[in-house]
Design a protein with these regions (language model features):
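Beta-strand-turn-beta hairpins that frame and shape the catalytic cleft
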Residues: 23-26, 164-177, 217-224, 247-248, ...
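Short beta-strand scaffold segments in enzyme catalytic cores
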Residues: 16-21, 179-180, 240-244
């Protein structure tokens, strides 16, 4: 009989997910947004092995359980190693789709409709050339970085088992609906199949109570509310995002995850913020934008067609919804570079 799991071998992350300590290094089960901020400050550090749990997306909270973009960058550029993703065969293609989109960008780009005058506009960048430059592998003499340089996969077999380097194995137990982790033949942990998300962590109860207003919030004629000022690798600060107030109406820009709850705790309701600007496609802001699609009815989103198309492809792979279904959740307003855009 295998030895019982060690309690100190399992670490629950504050943002969701579980890390299991093994002799071959930590293994993370479930990867909700920003969990790298938990592991960067942990004793064991950022894992190099990640188990993608099914389903990949929580529709109730609108949160991905497989946010691998920042762990990939940290492992590749800082640790100089590729990550290992453990998943089912059916899940692998979805993971490959959104990782390639996130790491390398769109395969095809057409900026003509995004610039006045099309190809005749001198301001139009050579985006293909820029992408090729940044895709150079700094550890291989500048040759083109491939997905295999960043990620390798280990797939569960038909019995729900997988063998990993270092004599580590993971077995799915249907009876208990969980995963057992073995280190050199000894069971060191058991992880539930269903990932538990912690209560919304944007605002703690004590802080929320202290922020309660004596009178209802009234949006300013002009102003800015900063939701966060940190970046995706800053464990001490919330990811950047803000609300721009114009004529008593709010426009949320690059919303981080759980931004709606953060605002609600300050009595800023959904009716106050009725438009969204997405400036880029990193996962820390994809997470908040995707979440808003599942929290409320269609919200107008203003961004370029290139950014929107990339967002839709990633969202489709993460949620399992078709691209047409994802688009149906969005009130999209394309932006053309140069002329002013009227919002609200």
């Amino acid at each position: 009989m295998p030895r019982k799991s060690k309690k100190n071998a399992v670490q629950k992350l504050s943002r969701g997910g579980v890390v299991v300590e093994t002799s071959a290094g930590p293994i993370q089960f479930g990867i909700p947004p920003e969990t790298i901020k938990d592991t960067m400050t942990s004793k064991s550090g950022v894992p190099g092995t990640f188990v993608a749990l099914d389903p990949l997306f929580n529709h109730e909270r609108g949160i991905s359980f497989c946010e691998l973009e920042f762990p990939i960058y940290f492992n590749f550029y800082v640790m100089r190693r590729k990550i290992r993703v453990v998943c089912s065969k059916s899940t692998k293609q979805r993971v490959v789709t959104f990782i390639k989109e996130a790491a390398f960008g769109p395969e095809k780009i057409n900026l003509i409709s995004e610039y006045i005058g099309g190809m005749g506009n001198r301001a139009m960048p050579d985006l293909h050339k820029e992408m090729s430059f940044f895709r150079r592998n700094p550890f291989k003499g500048g040759e083109r970085t491939q997905l295999s340089d960043m990620v390798t996969f280990s797939l569960f077999d038909k019995d729900g088992a997988v063998e990993l380097p270092g004599d580590i194995s993971i077995r799915y137990e249907k009876a208990t609906q969980g995963y057992r982790v073995f280190d050199n033949g000894v069971q060191v942990a058991e992880v539930a199949e269903k990932l538990e998300l912690p209560a919304n962590r944007k605002t703690k109860t004590k802080e929320a109570n202290s922020k309660r207003r004596k009178r209802p919030f009234y949006p300013p004629l002009f102003g800015v509310t900063v939701i966060g000022s940190g970046h995706g690798f800053d464990p001490t600060a919330d990811t950047s995002g803000f609300v721009l107030w114009i004529n008593h109406r709010g426009i949320i820009v690059d919303p981080p995850v759980d931004s709606t709850k953060w605002l609600a705790d300050r009595e800023v309701t959904r009716k106050h913020v009725n438009a969204l600007i997405l400036t880029h496609c990193h996962a820390d802001h994809d997470a908040g934008t995707l979440q808003k699609l599942f929290e409320e009815q269609k919200i107008p989103i203003y961004t370029s067609r290139t950014i929107m198309d990339s967002f839709v492809r990633k969202a489709s792979a993460i949620t399992g919804l078709s691209q047409s279904r994802v688009r149906s959740l969005i009130d999209y307003h394309p932006i053309t570079m140069g002329p002013p855009i009227r919002i609200n």
